[in-house]
From Swiss-Prot:
The keyword Plastid does not apply. Its cofactor is Mg(2+); Mn(2+). Zn(2+) binds at residues 404, 407, 422, 428. It holds the Pfam family DNA_ligase_OB. One of its GO terms (cellular component) is cytosol. NCBIfam families: dnlj (TIGR00575), PRK07956.1 (NF005932). It comes from Azobacteroides pseudotrichonymphae genomovar. CFP2. The keyword rRNA-binding does not apply. The active site is at residue 112. The lineage of its organism: Bacteria, Pseudomonadati, Bacteroidota, Bacteroidia, Bacteroidales. This is DNA ligase. It catalyses: NAD(+) + (deoxyribonucleotide)n-3'-hydroxyl + 5'-phospho-(deoxyribonucleotide)m = (deoxyribonucleotide)n+m + AMP + beta-nicotinamide D-nucleotide.
Length: 663
């Protein structure tokens, strides 16, 4: 046997041991024997570097530090699931599927893992890329870190897998590994992780793959995607994937009746704590991929799936105090400080009280015994008070402040709103810092600056509003403690680069109340310059799709303030994009043609297809009518659109047909 054959055999043997140990829990060698073989392989690879293989089991533990994570567009959007906490919600889902399909169907019931979603791309049996969910359209490339997760195969077994496919799953932090690392962190005087989900998410974003490899993350795969899948059954495809080396849970049941579904949910609701990982519900999926395609999707969720969330656990603890926090828009949020208590695997110290109405309804007093639960919210909430345990004297009632806790300005409350606001946004420190943080965020100006740095700049008097960022010089920063010249240069360059950010993102970054990313895009399209937007009236604004009186009044109020107008004049002076750059058509092959885009695409994203349509003289529309010329259809086109297209005689074209049109 030559050296190359010996190395190949060792790799194959260790891959097989890894699979048996981490995926199917059937180890066939001792840890000592495994480590011995791995060291032998490492030694041979070091002696014969010409036989290096990126997919060797020795390459699971990374040695390099990543400086950042690249942004990757998903081939298929990673949609979030609609969820329900009630049997009524399950029945509504089941009956809706029954009505739309009007044929027999099967529901696959699976556990809902409480971890981090991941998308894995394989080509020719090799792991090509691993991407986080991100915003559903774009995620972080965490391939280097995912390669250290031993239950994820770098090379697949067999040869009956598609040449190119995507498989999705959940990265979980098993309870044993989670408890072990928290014990170590406490012994090292480090703060423990709050829960396995947060720990898994933080670990995936760790810049050192060696740290990731030491934390023993696990992965369960739950959905196969691609053009050439072997079966129409979601369940059968997962069983095939298990044979290729993927870890697929055996806790899946194909149900034909609502009773079978409820039995599955009830069983695992009772026994969920016996599992080696955290779960927070059950996912129901229509098993047939053909039927999934017929059912399609709504805006952010597939119609063919729903998550049933287990009822939240409730605990009793003591209220010590209430903090009133000031957000970037001036909203005052009350937060309860509690006696630490264990709730659903998490140490809870704080709970949201939301607003004054809830405080009054609870009749809250300092020292009260509170009932706290953690449902679908990240921050737990107080749901009740044990008034019988309240002392007859000495308990101070919790009263909502009349003045801002940060700047002492009298608070205001708008009609039909539950929140109180501090109107002093030009001088209230938390609002100023929050506005600058929002303006600099990735989705807005993408300036390389964090909250701690903004705090440092604020204390030094370098910033009091968003425009001040463009006045900070390298010498100003070098006067501050712990700032090196390279860091100062990087910050200033990042600020200069932000001047190329398009108008709609600048508009979003201004932080106008109720103006999120989508609304900002619509405003920028309707009013191509900031000057036009600043003089728009209520009638002009409310004619825009998706903009009602509340948003319109907020925009008008923003531009009626002289401080804001002065701020915009400064931003314009510094060279920010406060106008829409008119697109120049590359071609006019689609001139006069209107398109609707529907479904999920493989070659390009929906946004890219919209751009191609406009660049070739076509027009994108959002609603289907007899005037629509084409529907550019991907996978999972909605059934309603299909029916309307047939009624209006609209031509439905595929990706390939569209691309031929613009060749």
């Amino acid at each position: 046997m030559n050296i190359k054959q010996k190395i190949d055999n060792l790799r194959q043997e260790i891959d097989n041991w890894n699979y048996r140990y981490y995926v199917i829990y059937q180890p066939i060698v001792s840890d000592f024997e495994f480590d011995k073989k791995l060291k032998e392989l490492e030694k041979l690879e070091a002696q014969y570097p010409e036989y290096y293989d990126y997919y060797s089991p020795t390459q699971r533990i990374g040695n390099d530090i990543n400086n950042n994570f690249a942004q990757i567009n998903h081939i298929y959007p990673m949609l979030s699931l609609s969820n329900t906490y009630s049997w009524e919600g399950i029945n509504d889902f089941y009956n809706r599927i029954k009505k739309i399909l009007n044929e027999n169907f099967v529901i696959a019931c699976e556990l809902k893992y409480d971890g981090v979603s991941i998308s894995l791309i394989y080509e020719s049996g090799l792991l090509l890329r691993a991407v986080t969910r991100g915003d559903g359209t774009t995620g972080d490339d965490v391939t280097t870190n995912i390669r250290t997760v031993k239950s994820i195969p770098l090379k697949l077994y067999g040869n009956n897998y598609p040449r190119f496919f995507e498989i999705r799953g959940e990265i979980v932090f098993p309870w044993a590994a989670f408890n072990k690392i928290n014990k170590e962190r406490i012994e090292n005087s480090e703060p423990p992780f709050a829960n396995p989900r947060n720990a898994a998410a933080g670990t995936l974003k760790t810049l050192n793959p060696q740290v990731v490899s030491q934390r023993n993350l696990d992965a369960y795969l739950y959905q196969l995607l691609g053009d050439n899948l072997s079966s129409d059954s979601h369940y059968e495809n997962l069983q095939l994937a298990q044979g290729w080396g993927f870890k697929v849970s055996n806790i899946i049941k194909c149900c034909k009746t609502i009773d079978e579904i409820e039995n599955f949910i009830n069983y695992w609701g009772k026994w969920k704590k016996s599992l080696p990982f955290a779960v927070d519900g059950v996912v129901l999926k229509v098993d047939s991929i053909r039927q999934q395609s017929l059912l399609g999707r709504i805006a952010k969720s597939p119609r063919w799936a729903i998550a049933y969330k287990f009822q939240s656990e409730t605990v009793k603890t003591t209220l010590h105090s209430v903090d009133f926090q000031v957000g970037r828009t001036g909203i005052i949020t009350p937060i309860a400080n509690l006696e630490p208590v264990l709730l659903s695997g998490t140490i809870v110290k704080r709970a949201s009280l939301h607003n004054e109405d809830i405080i009054n309804a609870l009749d809250l007093h300092i020292g009260d015994q509170c009932y706290v639960e953690k449902g679908g919210e990240i921050i737990p909430k107080i749901t009740g008070i044990n008034k019988e345990a309240r002392l007859t004297f000495g308990n101070k009632a919790v009263n909502f402040p009349k003045n801002c806790p940060a700047c002492n300005t009298p608070l205001i409350r708008f009609q039909n709103e539950t929140a109180y606001y501090c109107p002093n946004y030009t001088q209230c420190k938390p609002q100023i810092k929050g506005m600058i943080t929002h303006f600099a965020s990735r989705k807005a100006m993408n300036i390389n600056v964090g909250e701690e740095t903004i705090e440092t700049f604020y204390r030094a008097g370098l910033v009091r509003d968003i425009a001040d960022l463009y006045e900070i010089k390298i010498d100003d920063i070098l006067q501050l403690k712990r700032w090196a010249e390279k860091s100062a240069i990087n910050f200033v360059e990042s600020v200069q680069q932000s001047k190329q950010v398009p108008y709609e993102r600048v508009l979003y970054g201004l932080g106008i109340h109720f103006v999120g990313e989508v609304v900002a895009k619509r405003l920028a399209k309707a009013f191509p310059t900031i000057e036009q937007l600043s003089i728009a009236n209520n009638e002009q604004l409310t004619t825009i799709d998706g903009i009602g009186n509340q948003i319109a009044q907020s925009v008008i109020q923003y531009f009626s303030n002289e401080n804001n107008l002065q701020l915009i004049r400064r931003l314009k002076l510094y060279g920010l994009q406060l106008f829409t750059i008119q697109k120049i058509f590359i071609d006019n092959k689609l001139a006069g043609k209107t398109f609707i885009i529907s479904g999920i695409f493989r070659k390009y994203s929906r946004d890219k297809y919209k751009e191609l349509i406009e660049n070739n003289g076509g027009k994108n529309v959002s609603s289907l009518s007899a005037k629509t010329d084409f529907i550019l259809s991907g996978v999972n086109m909605g059934p309603v659109k299909l029916i309307k297209a047939q009624r209006f005689g609209i031509k439905i074209i595929s990706e390939d047909e569209f691309l031929k049109m613009i060749e």
